[in-house]
Curated annotation (Swiss-Prot):
Its EC number is 6.1.1.12. This is Aspartate--tRNA ligase. It catalyses: tRNA(Asp) + L-aspartate + ATP = L-aspartyl-tRNA(Asp) + AMP + diphosphate. Residues 195-198 are annotated as: Aspartate. It comes from Yersinia pseudotuberculosis serotype O:3 (strain YPIII).
Length: 598
């Protein structure tokens, strides 16, 4: 039906007859001529209709925005005075000979001249995707996945599919369950990741695997998360953690060079402990120059118990955040920051303005200055490298509250005061995570997942001191986003059983949930390691949006709903009966749908 795409026409096509298919982006009548901007997936070109071609001209008078049309015409060079440098096709236009109105359009429920609500955009997603900026993001996504496949193929990785219907295994989030009609009362689970299957592929001898795969997690959503998401999943045998990181860093560096023309350079490597200490986050945004400085040792003996209490508590922390030029902040702004850190459990935010660095106590302004001696103040100013015109913020509480609150404050202040270097890239690797962390019930949970190997520990040593164990794990972080994470896996049965035991999984539960894995580990399992990238998040970064829904064709809302199809919906009662499932409404509700499905 077409010979060319609208957005690909240029001066090399002048004089040629072309047939185009697409949509009317805009129509205007000027001096007896009808002009339209015609759009397809590759861009927009100007088409004009002359009364000398009567049939086409009369039809063109009927055109409205978003009519689907086909035109045939001759490519002409625009006069110099009419060249549109804002369009890739701005040097040419099409003199239309024939017009075929393929399909008419009703007035759109989305207004291209104003900002539409996200709910409206998601409800009419097929129309929202016609917008050039949305189409460009999906085209970029296609190019990115194509590049990844070429890279992985060139480096000897095999693209192998793993099952979508599998067994529920604890991986940190709730599973999406699928009932079995054949096996009454039993359920499949949609995979949270292909983790165990890719490990089994290593045991099968496929020493370099990758897959661009859908994953599913029933968890509370944020702007950068979806219930179904896409991973670039990778696993290797006979490669160390350093070697895996080297290949994956090469992939990302070449991807940035290909898509952005940017050389990211070698990625710095930072331990988890250093990242938390300096930046209050295990995914630090290094574009932001602000850092936390521990000052507990300097305030242990001050009379201000808000400081001295945590400073003398092994589980406490006192940290300062120096903000260059921050002395200009108003009291109202400072109070707002105090309210902000309260979100993270902080009971307040102490502050100190350095008006004159050389004047000691006389040169600072702060409600806490009266509790500080000249010696303590000078030690704090030296430790934080404070200068005249700066402000210091202090967090003092438990280690977790201070780290979380001051880390979040660091990011907010960096944005508010325009200290964060927007338009730049700051990648790094974070390594040496704790193997375990405390859970809400007083036990331990795996910080990554229960198949991660510890660094330099035997099963006996791990069982004796699990909270001291360091995981052989690594995360790739770019501009404060964790874009990928991986680890060296456990490849011996005894170590895997030890980890399960530390996590409170009984031997019977181990056999029930992971018997197939424990059996496989007995048969010459090679050492193996891997990593998974969040494709959606990578595309989000590369296309310059901060909303992951912008890079997914048909995303869900933060309530895990599809406004376009109205999913999830109530099931047909006959289908539920066939599955031997009964849906019961909660007490106190009058859910008609649930009653229908009982």
């Amino acid at each position: 039906m077409r010979t060319e795409y609208c957005g690909q026409l240029n001066l090399s096509h002048v004089g040629q007859s072309v047939t185009l298919c697409g949509w009317v982006n805009r129509r205007r009548d000027l001096g007896g001529l009808i002009f339209i901007d015609m759009r397809d997936r590759e861009g927009i070109v100007q088409v004009f209709f002359d009364p000398d071609h009567k049939a086409a001209f009369e039809q063109a008078s009927e055109l409205r925005n978003e009519f689907c049309i086909q035109i045939t015409g001759t490519v002409r060079a625009r006069p110099d005075s009419q060249i549109n440098k804002d369009m890739s096709t701005g040097e040419v236009e099409i003199f239309a000979n024939t017009l075929n109105i393929i399909n008419r359009s009703e007035p759109l429920p989305l207004d291209s001249n104003q900002i539409n609500s996200e709910e409206q955009r998601l409800k009419y997603r097929y129309l929202d995707l016609r917008r050039p900026e949305m189409a460009d993001r999906l085209k970029s996504r296609a190019k990115i996945t194509s590049f990844v496949r070429r890279f992985m193929d060139d480096h000897g990785f095999l693209d192998i599919e793993t099952p979508m219907l599998t067994k529920a295994t604890p991986e940190g989030a709730r599973d999406y369950l699928v009932p079995s009609r054949v096996h009454k009362g039993k359920f499949y689970a949609l995979p949270q990741s292909p983790q165990l299957f890719k490990q089994l592929l290593m045991m099968s001898g496929f020493d370099r695997y990758y897959q661009i795969v859908k994953c599913f997690r029933d968890e509370d959503l944020r702007a950068d998360r979806q219930p179904e998401f896409t991973q670039i999943d990778v696993e290797t045998s006979f490669m160390s953690a350093d070697q895996v990181r080297e290949v994956m860093e090469k992939l990302v560096r070449e991807l940035w060079q290909e898509t952005k023309g940017v050389d990211l350079g070698d990625f710095p490597v930072m331990t988890f402990a250093e990242a938390m200490r300096r930046y209050g986050s295990d995914k630090p945004d290094l574009r932001n120059p602000l850092e936390l400085v521990d000052v507990a040792s300097l305030v242990k003996d001050v009379e201000f118990k808000v400081f001295s209490g945590p400073a003398n508590d092994a589980k406490g922390r006192v940290a300062a955040l120096r903000v260059p030029g921050g002395a200009q902040l108003s009291r109202k702004q400072i109070d707002e920051y105090g309210q902000f850190v309260g979100i993270y459990g902080a009971k307040g935010l102490a502050w100190l303005k350095v008006n004159d660095r050389a004047a000691g106590l006389e040169g600072v302004q702060s409600p806490i200055a009266k509790f500080l001696s000249s010696e303590v103040l000078d030690a704090i100013l030296v430790a934080t490298q404070a200068e005249s015109g700066d402000i210091l913020f202090f967090g003092a509480d438990s280690y977790k509250i201070v780290t979380d609150a001051m880390g979040a404050l660091r990011l907010k202040v960096g944005r508010d005061l325009e200290l964060t270097r927007l338009g730049t890239w700051a990648p790094l690797w974070v390594v040496d995570f704790p193997m375990f962390e405390d859970d809400s019930e007083g036990g331990l949970t795996a910080m990554h997942h229960p198949f991660t190997a510890p660094k330099d520990m035997s099963p006996e040593q791990l069982a004796a001191a699990p909270t001291t164990a360091i995981a052989n794990a690594y995360d790739m972080v770019i501009n404060g986003y964790e874009v990928g994470g991986g680890s060296v896996r456990i490849h011996r049965t005894e170590m895997q059983q030890t980890v399960f035991g530390i996590l409170g999984i009984t031997e019977d539960e181990q056999r029930e949930k992971f018997g197939f894995l424990l059996d496989a580990l007995k048969f010459g399992t090679p050492p193996h390691a891997g990593l998974a990238f969040g494709l959606d998040r990578l595309v989000m970064l590369l296309t310059g949006t901060d909303n992951i829904r912008d890079v997914i064709a048909f995303p869900k809302t933060t309530a895990a709903a599809c406004l376009m199809t109205d999913a999830p919906s109530f099931a047909n009662p006959a289908s539920l009966q066939e599955l031997s499932i009964s849906v019961v409404a909660k007490k106190g509700t009058t859910d008609a749908g649930a009653e229908e499905n009982q």
